[in-house]
Design a protein with these regions (language model features):
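N-terminal Rossmann-like dinucleotide-binding module
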Residues: 7-36
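Redox-cofactor binding/interface segments in oxidoreductases and associated redox assembly factors
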Residues: 77, 83-84, 148-149
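NAD(P)-binding Rossmann-fold cofactor-contacting core
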Residues: 30-54
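Internal, well-ordered domain-core segments that constitute the primary functional module
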Residues: 133-214
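Rossmann-fold NAD(P)-binding glycine/threonine-rich loop
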Residues: 92-163
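Short helix-capping segments at alpha-helix termini
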Residues: 29-31, 56-63, 164-165, 187-189
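Short acidic low-complexity segments
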Residues: 65-78
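Long, compositionally biased stretches enriched for glycine and/or charged residues
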Residues: 188-451
């Protein structure tokens, strides 16, 4: 009989996310007896997660053991899979700092977790902690596979494979499969009938093909129907995530201009480009329904909901949840059993996309089986899509170089190359903004930045 894997969860205080991932795990026959090692630096949140996970396990008829740890290396000992999901500095103080300091300098943001000054600062405070996980994995579980859910995904993934190329890791996001489901809803079709091919970089991948299976078994291109639905005012569907602030206009407008649909949400995409958020251009904000300061608002709401949900889970006799769209359990099951699956992952560009820089971090379809995660070759992207992605890769390249070489100048250069920042601020203003952000974050950032 096959032994059960050990699954270590770093950042287990993220109770709701843990619930989604492990809810999927416990419904996989091969993973029902897995050893779940929960690790968090906050003992209170760790214990809360333990209560929820135990009820989740019992409700699903799973019978593995659960251990709780505040020491990372202890939790990682002999792990087969390592799930990483944390936010260094949290909503308070660090996310608030990213938004408030930028706002003082005249730069508005929506999410600030991927690119721009917010994404840059988040990378600088996060990557050293990811490197420490890689260091510990090298020592106590060198053959484990890391499933990384931490943003900024591209910069984090790149920095890890640059310094620790021997660590098996993949960056995971739900934007590819999540957006496909949204588009199916917009067109009133069953998501199960979709067939698509998607590629690019994290939060800026495009559906190169988007098709639907017809009654006779053939596939038809959905793009003409999608464009017609948008122009007729029938798409996007309102309130798709229960959030009236986010109306998804930006992505549909980009689809009209580019001919391909992008994976990440409109509120994210608006700040990856120079076109939607400009000082004194309230007309653009109104026309494209750009939700400024969306992430801080979302954090406040999520914290309130989290406390309410947590109390419900703690008081419930059993917890039954629907399957999530996250790839984690699919990957674990495929590697552990050898049953092949396909996921979309963020990996090193080793000849996968010809017209993006070799070595940059790309998001492509990956085959997963007992051999591990095997990215598939895409070839050449449409040139205008590659050009747009390159503007974001420029920032990722410079920030990754900054932290690998401990070069503060490259942090300024990364901010200078950010499309949104460059459209709003002058060079000296960008330098002043970076200086203020570094000073405001203090010890949350690596020491070399303060030398």
């Amino acid at each position: 009989m096959m032994t059960a894997p050990k699954i270590t969860f770093i950042g287990a205080g993220s109770t709701i996310f843990v619930k989604n991932i492990l809810g999927d795990v416990f419904h996989r026959e091969a993973l029902k007896t897995a050893h779940i090692a929960l690790m968090d630096i906050d003992p209170t949140r760790l214990e809360e997660s333990h209560i929820v996970v135990r009820k989740l396990m019992d409700s699903a008829g799973a019978s593995g053991k659960i251990t709780c740890h505040t020491q990372q290396k202890e939790a990682l000992q002999d792990a087969d899979f390592v799930v990483v999901a944390f936010q260094i500095g949290g909503y308070e103080p660090c996310t608030v700092t990213d938004f408030e300091v930028c706002k003082r300098h005249g730069l508005e943001q929506t999410i600030a977790d991927t690119l721009g000054p917010g994404g840059i600062m988040r990378a600088l405070r996060t990557i050293p902690h990811l490197w420490q996980i890689c260091e510990d994995m090298t020592e106590v579980c060198p053959d484990a596979t890391m499933l990384n859910y931490v943003n900024p995904m591209a910069m984090n993934t790149w920095a890890m494979y640059a310094r620790y190329p021997h660590i098996k890791q993949v960056g995971l996001c739900h934007s590819v499969q999540g957006t496909a489901e949204e588009l199916a809803r917009d067109l009133n079709i069953d998501p199960a009938t979709l067939r698509y091919r998607c590629a690019g970089i994290n939060h800026m991948a495009f559906y190169l093909e988007l098709e639907c299976k017809t009654a006779d078994g053939s596939y038809v291109n959905l793009y003409p129907e999608l464009l017609a639905a948008y122009e007729a005012g029938q798409a996007p569907k309102p309130n798709i995530h229960g959030n009236t602030r986010c109306q998804n206009i930006v992505r549909y407008e980009m689809f009209k201009k580019l001919g391909y649909f992008v994976t990440e949400s409109s509120e994210h995409f608006a700040e990856y480009t120079p076109w939607f958020i400009k000082p004194g251009r309230e007309d653009l904000i109104e026309r494209y329904k750009v939700p400024l300061d969306e992430y801080p608002k979302r954090c406040v709401e999520q914290l309130a909901n989290w406390h309410k949900e947590l109390e419900e889970y703690k008081n419930a006799s059993r917890i039954d949840i629907k399957p999530s769209r996250e790839y984690a359990s699919t990957i674990m099951n495929a590697i552990w059993t050898g049953e092949p699956s396909v996921i979309y992952g963020n990996v090193r560009n080793d000849g996968l996309i010809d017209n993006l820089p070799q070595g940059c971090c790309v998001e492509v379809a990956c085959l997963v089986d007992a051999n591990g995660i095997q990215p598939t070759k895409v070839g050449t992207l449409p040139s205008h899509l590659a050009a747009l992605m390159q503007t974001n890769i420029n920032v990722q390249t410079l920030l990754t170089e900054a932290i690998l070489t401990e070069n503060r100048d490259r942090v300024y250069h990364a901010a200078m190359m950010d499309p949104h920042t460059a459209a709003v601020l002058g060079i000296d203003e960008i330098y002043a903004l970076v200086d203020d952000l570094i000073a405001a974050h203090g010890d949350w950032l690596p020491g070399w930045l303060h030398r």
